[in-house]
Amino acid sequence: MLTSLRALPRAACRLSSINLFHGRSRQNYATEAKIPINIMEVGPRDGLQNEKGVIPVDVKVELIEKLGLAGCQLIEAGSFVSPKWVPQMAGTGEIISRMHRLPDVHYGVLVPNQKGLEGLLSVLNSYNASPDSDSTPPPSDEISIFTAATDAFTRANLNTSINESLAKLAPVAKQALDKGLRVRGYVSVAIVCPYTGQVDYKKVREVAKELLNMGCYEISLGDTVGRGTPTQVAEMLEEVKKELPVERLAGHFHDTFGTAVANVFTALEHGVRTIDSSVGGLGGCPYSPGATGNVATEDVLYALKNSKYTVIGTEYGKGTIDLDKMTEIGWWISEKLGRESISRAGRALRAKKIRDAEMVADGEVRAKL
């Protein structure tokens, strides 16, 4: 069972930078150093934003805390967007203020515009004025900004063109950087647009470069519709890498057509070292008709077992992200939402756990006969 985060002592230190390490693989990679990769857990934000029912603040807080205890060190905790348009993200300020924050975890929030940034800064100002500011990590140390690779998608999502969205984001990024925040960028519909079809990868490269020039430390390239294939992912990345360092890129894949895990491996083989994923496969996009959830964190973790890659995590996951704990969390949050986890690995691991428990119980009964 997951330990209660409330029982843990508060660490008297600030958030540390990401600590990459080299582990040793087994089996086929017994003599080679593993390649470290990061997972950005987007379940609390991208995973929940498209849910129809009301999700209590307490549940969101508990979700983020559980993820930290499972070893996640990169967590997108919410977004400062209009509750009129994305009601599930209401209360993000309260959530990041209330949650027990671990010192070696980065808690990011998405801000779509200047107003969103002002909402976050208000929370941070309250934190800085509190007596706990010297002994507890801040509510957030990172923002994400986003645009897309087609005008049709930005007009549906932001009611603006790509160029107009970039012009509005530039001062947001600058102010955030001036305040000491890290800035991450998203490029949606990097492969297929739900409104215009196949995307021009040169446009993906151009938009990603603009975000990089704004000061984004990393650009997440999204297969928002989930229609991308490994071949398309490879072609897109090769185009973007012509002008952007691959170490500044991340992959964000939805699993609409069941290709997300394959796309993750393609991205890794092309040098990408950060993958966005969502516990329980939560997710979708309100402006992308037909899109299903993000690639499940459990599926990524399971697929990477015995590979040449190692996922970086915190001490709570023993230096990685604990697959068993993530499976528990995936089922817990899915049940809170009134459904089963859609993670394939999560379903299989839970079924195995139930079977094993039944076999133990059956053995105990037979022993008493």
Predicted regions and their residues:
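Catalytic cores and adjacent flexible loops of soluble metabolic enzymes
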Residues: 2-369
